[in-house]
Amino acid sequence: MLEFNNSTPLTMGVELELQIVNRRDYNLTRGSDDLLQIINKTEHGYDIKPEITESMIEIATAVHTDHVEMLAELTAMRTLLVTAANKLNLGLAGGGAHPFQHWEDQRIYPTDRYRLVSELYGYLAKQFTVYGQHIHIGCASGDDAIRLTHLLARQIPHFIALSASSPFYQGVDTSFQSSRLTSINAFPLSGTMPFVSDWEAFNTYFIKMSHLGIVASMKDFYWDIRPKPEYGTVEIRVCDTPLAIETAVALGAYAQTLSKYYFAHTELEPTQDTYLTYSYNRFQACRFGLNGALINPITGTQSSIKDDILQTFELLKDVAEELGTTDAIELLRQRVLSGQSDADWLRASYEKSGSLSDAVRQQSAVWMAT
């Protein structure tokens, strides 16, 4: 049985997976161990660890109630990482996928779990060299987490479109705003959580899956959004890692604001109909970003993802003011109004220079704030 470790509602944290690149041609490089060795010479107290392949590193914030404090922590973590990277002549970058790396060149990081993943999933494990942002929102109970997971599913296309930063893959313009999520689609336990009504029903489902030998823990579910019982949170997993930490923090604040709205409006009940249009809306967000179409499964009406986001921001105005997230929502609103995503910025960088290496150089300069 899974125990849900109840946490303070609306606390939040983010995890960011970062690209490690060389400074010759800005391809990925196996630098995570060297980076960690330098970083761990200081007693920094931050959560910085390797990821599934050696050209990735993950940073995770502490638990926060205030997005401004979260930005301050991420800024300090960035300074620590950039100092270490400079000593090794390495670059660090955001972005959901490296524009021209080849998956077969990657090497699995040597931990027991990653070896098991590699043995089970074969080449998919190396293809998992993609870079995402995960957002955690605290919940008072397992029942609250199940409800919030279903309600936030409606806004998953928002998070995809707002964070989209992976237009290139293996040297090719994919025509997608976020190509990263297609790498995750291949895993058999990706997609969405089944439509269960409460924590007891979820436990029944988990126990069945465990007895069938399909899963051993919650880590085996690669769902877009899932409860995280050991943290007492709901975890949104669809975001590409943004090019800048300010965007990452704003996305966390948006999730916090949405969650506050849903917690306050207890009359809003999840409906299974949300999932009728889920895959369609998700694809539209990945392929077209802000310009994608979004079908409301309840009303049957269709709008652009851009317009739906702006309407949601308007709906959340009072909640954002109460929570103190107005500035973060405004940052995202201005991005939406400009119609420019990180993916568009990367395409423009490539068009200007004609070189994907130079585009990654600029991408790295943005994250490292150099």
From Swiss-Prot:
The keyword RNA-binding does not apply. GO terms for molecular function: ATP binding; glutamate-cysteine ligase activity. One of its GO terms (biological process) is modified amino acid biosynthetic process. It comes from the Bacteria. Its EC number is 6.3.2.2. It catalyses: L-cysteine + L-glutamate + ATP = gamma-L-glutamyl-L-cysteine + ADP + phosphate + H(+). The keyword ATP-binding applies. It holds the Pfam family GCS2. Keywords: ATP-binding, Ligase, Nucleotide-binding. InterPro entries: GCL_type2/YbdK_subfam, GCS2, Gln_synth/guanido_kin_cat_dom, YbdK. It is an enzyme of class 6 (ligase). Belongs to the glutamate--cysteine ligase type 2 family. YbdK subfamily. ATP-dependent carboxylate-amine ligase which exhibits weak glutamate--cysteine ligase activity. This is Putative glutamate--cysteine ligase 2. It comes from Herminiimonas arsenicoxydans. The lineage of its organism: Bacteria, Pseudomonadati, Pseudomonadota, Betaproteobacteria, Burkholderiales.
